[in-house]
Amino acid sequence: MTGRLAIEDVRPRIAGGSQPSKAVIGEMIPVSALVWREGHDAVSATLNVISPTGEVTRTTMEPAPFDQDKMFSSFVPDALGTWKFRVDAWSDPMSTWRHAVIAKIEVGQDEDDLFNDLEHGAQLFEKAAENASKPTAQKLFAVADSLRSNQPLRARVAPALSKEIHEILHEHPVRELLTRGQNHTVLVERKKAQFSSWYELFPRSTGGWDTDGNPVHGTFSTTAKALKRVAAMGFDTVYFPPIHPIGEIHRKGKNNSLIAEANDVGSPWAIGSAAGGHDAVHPQLGTLKDFQALVSTAEELGLSVALDLALQAAPDHPWARTHQDFFTVLADGTIAYAENPPKKYQDIYPLNFDNNKSAIYAELKRIVLFWIAQGVTVFRVDNPHTKPANFWEWLISTIHETHPEVIFLAEAFTRPARLYGLGKVGFSQSYTYFTWRTTKSELEEFGTEIAAMADVSRPNLFVNTPDILHESLQHGGRAMFAIRAALAATLSPLWGVYSGFELYENEAVSANSEEYLDSEKYELRPRDFTAALEQGDSLEPYLGTLNAIRRAHPALQQLRVIDFHSTDNENIIAYSKVDPVSGDAILVVINLDPTHAHSATVDLTMNAIGCEDVDHFTVTDLVTGAQFPWNKRTYVRLDPCADVAHILELPVVEESKRKALSWRTPTDYSN
């Protein structure tokens, strides 16, 4: 406590206030604080919001919906940049007076008993009028006059206790013992940092086959043609694994073989050869000019190109000749290759960020700025948790000084301390453990956690990756692909699909492995998407439906507000999402069993969707268009042979109830 009144536990407050919390333009940001004082006099608080240009707005806070010890409000930023907010506490003499007068009248005290109270009230209303507009001031002076009049007691106080005057005082409070809090920061990014649908493909696999049926190496030109299908499915970010020259020394062969054949293309993550390094493109893909044309084509289709930022090098990367101090040099004079004992990665040299810090920092900044100059504003960062956190904090903040639109996604499958730590130092998005959350209880815990951590980290839920083919997809049949897509597309506003998912690719390299057989990481994998679609053997239409629903419904574009509802079947999960800005509301009910039909009674927590327990309403299934009557307890049946999920449009939440729905019990960000 630093002032006359106590202001504690202000949220959001990240890393002790040393890091900004996260938000995007148009998002409702809930703010809370514990405000208290001695005795029985009422206290209140003001939320002061300072925009990046210095414009200040002030809002009187209210008691939190489910925690009367906390004061609560919110704001919606409308511009990029660093915003600030401050909670000021103050004694609320008007509320104290109001409470005392009502209590005294209720026990039978008369005008004489209340003489001092009435005069004190009149003075308070005159004070409130000092900073009000002329029409409002006239109303407040009239209340003061009424309190001093000779009318019967209840008539004298009626104007002071009216709803209209109460609302006026909320906007024009009398503040005493004002105690200023500390400033806290919020980094506001563009909406794409929070809401986007990603599709991953290897440009080199877009070349099709030759007349003998052999794969042909793709180019940026063939990739541009492939983007039309991606855009038609409703994806808005297309992510390419590294597009740079691939090392030839210790090149990996098919299925991660240590011995490469003459025509093996190697792993794109083994970056660098005689043809160049991180600022070059693979010669077989085309030229830098061809890449620029690809970016332009993507933009015309409504797609952003995301590039892989893999900070490592092949043994024949130019750095290995010109900057050996970027690496760890062993006693025998050789450069240390990557190891994760007992695994060895002879085709990759990891960087040593402690050898020549200034040079390596400058070089990596140059590379990022180089690709920004080519039109890239989204980067998927490979294994950032294996590089120093202070490097990322420096790089991201430095890039954002001149390019605040740039988005960094952390590909970090790691423990919470690292995962959330990367969010704190600046990453806009992160991969998560969604892939391994398959049961109802696991998904409910996961969904609750990602919403609670929205001020720190934004989860991008990929249903598969070139590295990860989960056993549920290997053995769950085609319905499981739809189930996982429905979960990913609705649990988080960020989700992603790696190419081949829509073709139900499910064959692992071996039993108990999550690696794909004939992994695209090591060979060309052209696919005939058109034939599969024509044969009805493709998930493309369903993916397109999911993305269309997401674009149409703000409830699925926000992360903070999600509530899980009770069902009496462990195979049926139900959750609602509400956008507190627009009031848009969605209910999702999914059968988690890909092989059997299941039924359940869904027991809604009605206030979580802005309804009363007695309400009845009609919902529309946004997948099928069917309509159903709905109430607090409703029977559902889902057969994976027909529909794995209901995605239901609920009645729009009344405006007066929306802000309260954004309240969440503050989370401990220390983990």
UniProtKB/Swiss-Prot annotation:
<feature type="active site" description="Proton donor">
    <location>
        <position position="411"/>
    </location>
</feature>
<dbReference type="Pfam" id="PF21702">
    <property type="entry name" value="GLGE_C"/>
</dbReference>
<feature type="binding site">
    <location>
        <position position="312"/>
    </location>
    <ligand>
        <name>alpha-maltose 1-phosphate</name>
    </ligand>
</feature>
<dbReference type="InterPro" id="IPR049171">
    <property type="entry name" value="GLGE_C"/>
</dbReference>
<dbReference type="InterPro" id="IPR026585">
    <property type="entry name" value="GlgE"/>
</dbReference>
<dbReference type="GO" id="GO:0016758">
    <property type="term" value="F:hexosyltransferase activity"/>
</dbReference>
<dbReference type="GO" id="GO:0030979">
    <property type="term" value="P:alpha-glucan biosynthetic process"/>
</dbReference>
<feature type="binding site">
    <location>
        <begin position="521"/>
        <end position="522"/>
    </location>
    <ligand>
        <name>alpha-maltose 1-phosphate</name>
    </ligand>
</feature>
<dbReference type="GO" id="GO:0004553">
    <property type="term" value="F:hydrolase activity, hydrolyzing O-glycosyl compounds"/>
</dbReference>
<dbReference type="InterPro" id="IPR021828">
    <property type="entry name" value="GlgE_dom_N/S"/>
</dbReference>
<comment type="function">
    <text>Maltosyltransferase that uses maltose 1-phosphate (M1P) as the sugar donor to elongate linear or branched alpha-(1-&gt;4)-glucans. Is involved in a branched alpha-glucan biosynthetic pathway from trehalose, together with TreS, Mak and GlgB.</text>
</comment>
<feature type="active site" description="Nucleophile">
    <location>
        <position position="382"/>
    </location>
</feature>
<comment type="subunit">
    <text>Homodimer.</text>
</comment>
<dbReference type="InterPro" id="IPR013783">
    <property type="entry name" value="Ig-like_fold"/>
</dbReference>
<feature type="binding site">
    <location>
        <position position="252"/>
    </location>
    <ligand>
        <name>alpha-maltose 1-phosphate</name>
    </ligand>
</feature>
<feature type="binding site">
    <location>
        <position position="383"/>
    </location>
    <ligand>
        <name>alpha-maltose 1-phosphate</name>
    </ligand>
</feature>
<keyword id="KW-0328">Glycosyltransferase</keyword>
<keyword id="KW-0808">Transferase</keyword>
<feature type="site" description="Transition state stabilizer">
    <location>
        <position position="467"/>
    </location>
</feature>
<dbReference type="InterPro" id="IPR006047">
    <property type="entry name" value="Glyco_hydro_13_cat_dom"/>
</dbReference>
<keyword id="KW-0119">Carbohydrate metabolism</keyword>
<feature type="binding site">
    <location>
        <position position="347"/>
    </location>
    <ligand>
        <name>alpha-maltose 1-phosphate</name>
    </ligand>
</feature>
<protein>
    <recommendedName>
        <fullName>Alpha-1,4-glucan:maltose-1-phosphate maltosyltransferase</fullName>
        <ecNumber>2.4.99.16</ecNumber>
    </recommendedName>
</protein>
<dbReference type="InterPro" id="IPR013780">
    <property type="entry name" value="Glyco_hydro_b"/>
</dbReference>
<dbReference type="InterPro" id="IPR017853">
    <property type="entry name" value="Glycoside_hydrolase_SF"/>
</dbReference>
<comment type="similarity">
    <text>Belongs to the glycosyl hydrolase 13 family. GlgE subfamily.</text>
</comment>
<dbReference type="Pfam" id="PF11896">
    <property type="entry name" value="GlgE_dom_N_S"/>
</dbReference>
